[in-house]
Swiss-Prot record:
It comes from Bacillus subtilis (strain 168). This is DNA polymerase III subunit alpha. Its main location: cytoplasm. GO terms for cellular component: cytoplasm; nucleoid. It comes from the Bacteria. It catalyses: DNA(n) + a 2'-deoxyribonucleoside 5'-triphosphate = DNA(n+1) + diphosphate. GO terms for molecular function: 3'-5' exonuclease activity; DNA-directed DNA polymerase activity; nucleic acid binding. Keywords: Cytoplasm, DNA replication, DNA-directed DNA polymerase, Nucleotidyltransferase, Transferase. SMART domains: POLIIIAc. DNA polymerase III contains a core (composed of alpha, epsilon and theta chains) that associates with a tau subunit. This core dimerizes to form the PolIII' complex. PolIII' associates with the gamma complex (composed of gamma, delta, delta', psi and chi chains) and with the beta chain to form the complete DNA polymerase III complex. Interacts with SSB (sbbA) via the latter's 6 C-terminal residues.
């Protein structure tokens, strides 16, 4: 007797199953099952993955779900019911049932809906905890019989079954079900109620249940859970040996269930054109209109290219798609929403350019349409659009309103139990302390996709910890079993689907955000179904551009059209050449700054190339690219015929489009064929490489190139196929970078205001940008209750600090402050508390405003303001309570105010600490400032100077603001530090050998005199600390000195005069010794020749006398 599992939960029943879909189907195949069902709780998240996996193994997929169903319209109680799709109609009804359960009626399905969606569905009671089972266990047999017949009347005879599960040990219930079946004539079927795959996975399942409940295993009641594994046929035959008809019923049900999900077809929606015009004709009309708008009277190249692209688009039936995108982009522009110049290969389309979907002229920038839409490789077009992250939702709302709520949805994504999360979660339910679980998780290398098995192999320390503890070994073992399972559902950052038919005919939906549904299928499975997917991306840099340009327009009455700026502007490229790129899209990293300083870019083309090259692999070509640009290395072309293709990149292959053009030029490939070649060779499979080599060489020979030349060029194509970057994307994103650089170069104050406002809430970034602003000469004004706004603002040639950037001052409080001061400025603390609504004024907020300096203008010291808070609040409360009566007698000139509670100002160290706490930065001063003269005398440089002197040994005076100690793989301690001074912040690292010596002085808040050097690591400047001592322990005898050796050949009046001039130009506190080689004599120079021993003076002396002849000795 055969059997089919009809009640199966996968990991998509979130935290209620330890069975991954692929593994579930693989095990069913191994056990020889011909059919298998999937019946997750309320959802169909895994349906397509399950369907494909079953089809791939020749198993009949039975798609179902477990629905909660209300017993009546009162909606008081809902009970589970297993529903299986018999047919495509049944599958579509399941889509609707799941959508209802996940959006309109999360508690359960109303009887009327169950009746509406019953067609094509087989229903099975769950075996326990269902409505029928609950009635039977309550002794209500007759009611159970009545309810059973009602269910049968809904689904039809032969489409409603009782689940019979004797293996769960409830003998009384099992006998009652058999009796009920006999009395009602409704058949029983065997079901397994699968929640995990193998019996040894039971502990993992119990663990998941505890994670879901937020309990520890020791707290949960000890349940004698039945085995809920995917039992083999032999075991099921043994369980049901006395009732083989139940096994047979499962097979009969499976034979009825035949669903055919259409995969691979395209479901492009149609665009509602005016007057019934065809989409092809309408697209042509608006493209011609756009071409004239862009170019006036375009030349023949543009007309030919446009006609070619339109022909391809029409032939591939994508006219509606372009019209849909054109329409919502048009709406965005009409609403003043900034849109990106393009993203990905879409920037290579002239149609997209003339429709104002992109802002990149593909002919001017040598971009290829075939890289976007290849007529020789049919695939869905993919236009990703960037919007400001604050306005992206407006565009999605427009699309939903135009096409209807049931035709537009955002896309689901799943957070999984990755290695670290699995270890932490399992550790918690096993009672491992959070600290220990965290320490264990931190031993897992931080790399995307890292598995627990890989982590144990790569981390000897993790392996050691696990071997030392049987409890941790158990935690690890179970974490491995649940690793990779979905933990929660969330919304994809960008994806939106659009459908001609109601989405619930194709995909189950669930509640989303802002009234927009969320698909239950993830992106890959939506593509399998042929749904049109578009990416609406929120780009912070566009928000920044929008913010800066609107400020300039509002304050300066200058409307900036970034589409018409010069991409060779001297001021812009001077800024870029200095590496002054903080806040500049994709050009901010330390490594990129270094490249820009060496490259000295002179136009957009250089930035495009750098963005394309600055990646692992292509990076190795950057030095050659720079040397060729500046004429320090000859430009070599693989063949002279390739000069026009490679001359912009000085003979270096940088872009995928160059590979395509080379194949077209030399081998006569169409650009479509060239794109196929590029894709093929990038896979690096030998048989494909050999086949394509023959194809390429054959084409070259037809065009009379030699075999050697053809092979040489093909080898280059193979080498760069993986390295080559999408030029269309590089051009578009480089334009955003150049636009921001233009704004920074020409409107630095507005740029800095916009940049600072964009990172409100991120203390580290605000701190970094404020230090940079001060370093570049921009004055930052303190926060002020009378002058500050929500954003950072420009005020009299300076930047005024934002109120919202003060900790504990929320959005509503800022609004209330702004509204209250509109009539007149606040006069004092009492006036402030009286006029700002009491819902916003509380002690915490007032303390934050006072500590930050936002109330300094009231003319009292901060300690006095703090001491007067209670009086001010009581005064405001008293007058607010009597406001109606007092208002009859008070006028503007009459006021009763209490007096300040005057007290001495707080010590400077406390004032600064409170400033740092509320602003994230030492604003008015820095704790180190009191030591600056002493530090300079000791030869210490600032953090800003140190960051500009990479790889040089330096001394610094710093405040240690953060310390993070870790253990290396070999079990040694080391530390990562955050250091600061008046000029900025910097990360530092203390390796194990140094940590052993320095750990006594490494504590947060310590003021240190330290030595080491800066290095660029992982694209960040990091200080490698070699020595450190507390500033308070500094010894005057350790004062540094500069030793200058004057070789015999240098002993001349001219050289001595130059030395004297350099010393006098860099006066300071560091002593200078001269050693005359000829006389073998050392002379200590008088104080009048003491210098500020920074890297600038040392560089000048070394340049004059030689590297080895100038030494700064310290410690």
């Amino acid at each position: 007797m055969s059997f089919v599992h009809l009640q199966v939960h996968s990991g998509y029943s979130l935290l209620n199953s330890a069975a991954a879909v692929e593994e579930l189907v693989s095990e069913a195949d191994r056990l020889g099952y011909a059919s298998l069902a999937l019946t997750d709780d309320h959802v169909m998240y895994g349906a397509i993955q399950f369907y494909k996996a079953c089809k791939a193994r020749g198993i009949n997929p039975i798609i179902g779900l477990t629905a909660s169903v209300f017993t009546d319209d009162s909606e008081l109680e809902a009970y589970p019911l297993v529903l299986l799709a018999k047919s495509n109609t049944g599958y579509q009804n399941l889509l609707k049932i799941s959508s209802v359960l996940q959006s309109k009626s999360k508690g359960g399905l109303k009887p009327k809906w169950l009746h509406s969606y019953r067609e094509g569905i087989i229903a099975i009671t769950p075996g326990e905890k269902g409505y029928i089972e609950t009635l039977l266990e309550g002794g209500l047999f007759e009611q159970a019989a009545q309810a059973s017949l009602e269910f049968q009347s809904i689904f039809g005879k032969g489409a409603f079954y009782f689940s019979y599960q004797p293996f769960k040990g409830n003998q009384v219930l099992s006998e009652q079900i058999l009796k009920l079946s006999e009395e009602t004539g409704i058949p029983v079927t065997a079901t397994g109620d699968v929640h995990y795959i193998r019996k040894e996975d039971k502990a993992a399942y119990r663990c998941l249940k505890a994670i879901k409940a937020g309990e520890k295993l020791t707290d949960a009641p000890a349940e004698d859970l039945p085995d809920l594994d995917l039992k083999p046929l032999e075991e099921m035959q043994n369980i049901y040996r006395e009732h083989p008809e139940a096994l047979q019923a499962s097979v009969e049900i499976a034979e009825q269930c035949r669903v055919d999900v259409s995969l691979g077809q395209t479901r492009l929606p149609s665009f509602p054109t005016p007057d019934g015009t065809s989409a092809d004709d309408y697209l042509t009309d608006i493209c011609m209109e756009g071409l004239r708008s862009r170019f006036g009277k375009p030349d023949e190249r543009y007309l030919r290219r446009l006609q070619y692209e339109l022909d391809v688009i029409k032939r591939m039936k994508f006219s509606d798609y372009f019209l849909i995108v054109w329409d919502f982009m048009k709406h965005a522009h009409e609403k003043g929403i900034v849109t990106g110049p393009g993203r990905g290969s879409a920037a290579g389309s002239l149609v997209a350019y003339v429709l104002y979907i992109t802002d990149v002229d593909p002919i001017k920038h040598h971009l290829l349409f075939e890289r976007f839409l290849n007529p020789e490789r049919v695939s869905m077009p993919d236009i990703d659009i960037d919007f400001p992250d604050t306005r992206r939702d407006e565009v999605i709302q427009y699309v939903q309103q135009k096409y209807g709520a049931m035709h537009v949805a955002q896309i689901i994504t799943f957070g999984t139990l990755a290695a670290k999360a699995a270890l932490r979660d399992v550790g918690r339910v096993f009672g491992v302390s959070p600290k220990e679980a965290d320490q264990l998780a931190k031993l897992i290398p931080s790399r995307p996709g890292m598995t627990l098995d890989e982590a144990r192999q790569q981390s000897p320390q993790l392996d050691k910890r696990l071997r030392e503890s049987s409890l941790l070994q158990q935690v690890y073992s179970i974490a491995r079993k649940i690793e990779g399972l979905p933990r929660h559902a969330s919304t994809h950052a960008a994806g939106v689907v659009l459908s001609e038919e109601p989405l619930t005919d194709v995909v189950p939906l669930q509640e989303g955000h802002e009234g927009i549904y969320l698909t239950q299928y993830a992106m890959d499975h939506l593509e399998d179904l042929g749904l049109l997917k578009m990416d609406f991306l929120g780009l912070r840099n566009l928000t920044l551009i929008e913010s800066i340009t609107s400020m300039i327009e509002k304050e300066e009455n200058i409307k900036i059209d970034l589409s018409s700026i010069s991409y060779s502007d001297d001021k812009t490229f001077s800024l870029l050449s200095k590496g002054d790129t903080t806040g500049i899209f994709q050009l901010e990293s330390a490594g990129m700054r270094s490249v820009l300083k060496r490259l000295k870019p002179s136009g957009l083309e250089d930035i495009v190339a750098v963005n394309a090259l600055y990646r692992p692999g292509p990076m190795e070509n950057i030095p050659l690219f720079i040397d060729r640009k500046h004429g320090r290395a000859p430009v070599h072309y693989p063949h002279e015929d390739l000069r026009s293709i490679l001359e912009d990149t000085y003979g270096v292959i940088v872009y995928q489009e160059q590979i395509m053009m080379i194949a077209s030029r030399m081998a006569g490939f169409s650009l479509g064929e060239a794109d196929l070649l590029r894709r093929a060779v990038s896979k690096k499979k030998k048989e494909i490489l050999d086949r394509e080599r023959s194809h390429f060489v054959e084409g070259c020979l037809k065009k009379e190139y030699s075999v050697d030349t053809a092979n040489e060029v093909y080898d280059l194509i193979v080498k760069f196929a993986n390295y080559g970057f999408n030029r269309s994307h590089a051009v578009a994103y480089s334009m955003i970078g150049c636009q921001l650089a233009y704004l920074k170069a020409h409107y630095p104050l507005y740029f800095m205001c916009g940049l600072l406002t964009s990172v409100i809430g991120n203390e580290d970034k605000i701190s970094q940008y404020l230090y940079e602003a001060k370093g570049s000469g921009i004055r930052i004004l303190p926060p002020s209750v009378n002058k500050s706004s929500f954003p950072f603002t420009v005020e009299n040639g300076s930047v005024r600090y934002s109120l919202r950037a003060i900790k504990s001052v929320g959005v509503s409080a800022v609004k209330d402050i702004y509204k209250a001061r509109k009539e007149k400025p606040f006069e004092d603390l009492f006036d402030f508390c009286f006029r700002v609504p009491s819902k916003s004024v509380n002690r915490k907020m007032l303390e934050a405003l006072i500590f930050s300096g936002a109330m300094d203008e009231f003319g009292q010291n901060r300690a006095t303001l703090l001491a007067s808070i209670d009086v001010a609040l009581e005064h405001a409360e008293l007058f607010a309570a009597d406001d109606d009566q007092m208002g009859l007698f008070l006028d503007e000139s009459f006021s009763i105010k209490p007096k300040y509670v005057e007290t001495e100002e707080l010590p400077l160290v406390d004032l600064l600490a409170f400033e740092k706490e509320t602003l994230g930065i030492y604003f008015s001063n820095h704790p180190l400032s009191a030591f600056r003269k002493q530090l300079t005398a000791q030869g210490a440089v600032s953090i800003l100077q140190a960051q500009r002197a990479v790889k040089r040994q330096l001394s610094l005076g710093v405040l240690l603001s953060k310390i993070k100690t870790i253990r290396t793989k070999t079990g040694q301690n080391m530390a990562f530090l955050t250091l600061s001074d008046e000029t900025g912040e910097m990360e530092a690292v203390v390796f194990p050998e140094q940590f052993r010596q320095l750990s006594p002085v490494l504590r947060e808040g310590a003021l240190l005199f330290t030595a080491g050097k800066c290095e660029v690591r992982q694209d960040k400047i990091q200080f490698i600390m070699s020595r450190a001592e507390l500033l308070e322990d500094m010894d005057a005898e350790k004062a540094p000195s500069v030793y200058i050796k004057i070789e015999s050949s240098q002993h001349s009046q001219e050289i001595l005069a130059k030395i004297k001039r350099i010393l006098l130009e860099h006066k300071g506190e560091t002593g200078v010794y001269l050693y005359y080689e000829r006389q073998k004599q050392t002379i200590k120079l008088p104080e009048s020749f003491h210098i500020n021993a920074d890297h600038q003076v040392l560089y000048r002396l070394k340049e004059l006398l030689g590297q080895k002849n100038v030494v700064l000795k310290q410690w």
